[in-house]
């Protein structure tokens, strides 16, 4: 009996490696360039490995635009450092984006918590509702 195997494409492996290496590089660059603190949350690489969408989250959400702008300005330097760290013939061009999934998740969590605070007595009773 053969076990089903999950296929991992090269882009998935490269993406994971870029995320690990770039996470370390970005952490140092943020400190060196006085940028707001960010961390790399995800990396999506194009099939041809020419471009990488780098998603970052900011500790201070209100300074996220400043952080992404700063990373875009030093993207060439970061790509050079990434090339030194990785054994790839061509290192993808880096495109930085703010990852708002954490903010959206937090907003949903707050909404759910607010619903819990309201309690079931505020919800319309199923028997009182008119059929549609």
Curated annotation (Swiss-Prot):
Location(s) in or outside the cell: Cytoplasm
GO cellular component labels: cytosol
Pfam families: RBFA
UniProt keyword list: Cytoplasm, Ribosome biogenesis
Any one biological process term the GO annotation gives: ribosome biogenesis
Molecular function terms from GO: ribosomal small subunit binding
Similarity comment: Belongs to the RbfA family.
Known role: One of several proteins that assist in the late maturation steps of the functional core of the 30S ribosomal subunit. Associates with free 30S ribosomal subunits (but not with 30S subunits that are part of 70S ribosomes or polysomes). Required for efficient processing of 16S rRNA. May interact with the 5'-terminal helix region of 16S rRNA.
Subunit structure: Monomer. Binds 30S ribosomal subunits, but not 50S ribosomal subunits or 70S ribosomes.
Entry protein name: Ribosome-binding factor A
Source organism per UniProt: Xanthomonas campestris pv. campestris (strain ATCC 33913 / DSM 3586 / NCPPB 528 / LMG 568 / P 25)
Taxonomic lineage of the native organism: Bacteria, Pseudomonadati, Pseudomonadota, Gammaproteobacteria, Lysobacterales
Name of the gene encoding the protein in the UniProt record: rbfA
């Amino acid at each position: 009996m053969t076990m089903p195997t999950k296929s991992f494409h090269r882009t998935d492996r490269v993406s994971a490696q870029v995320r690990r290496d770039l996470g370390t590089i970005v952490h140092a660059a943020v400190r060196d360039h006085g940028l707001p603190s960010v961390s790399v949350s995800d990396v999506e690489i194009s099939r041809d490995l020419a471009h990488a969408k780098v998603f970052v989250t900011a500790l201070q959400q209100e300074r996220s635009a400043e952080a992404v702008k700063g990373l875009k300005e030093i993207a060439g330097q970061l790509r050079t450092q990434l090339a030194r760290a990785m054994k790839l013939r061509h290192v993808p061009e880096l495109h930085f984006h703010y990852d708002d999934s954490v903010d959206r998740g937090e907003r949903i969590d707050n909404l759910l918590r607010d619903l819990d605070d309201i309690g079931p007595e505020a919800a319309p009773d199923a028997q009182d509702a008119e059929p549609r």
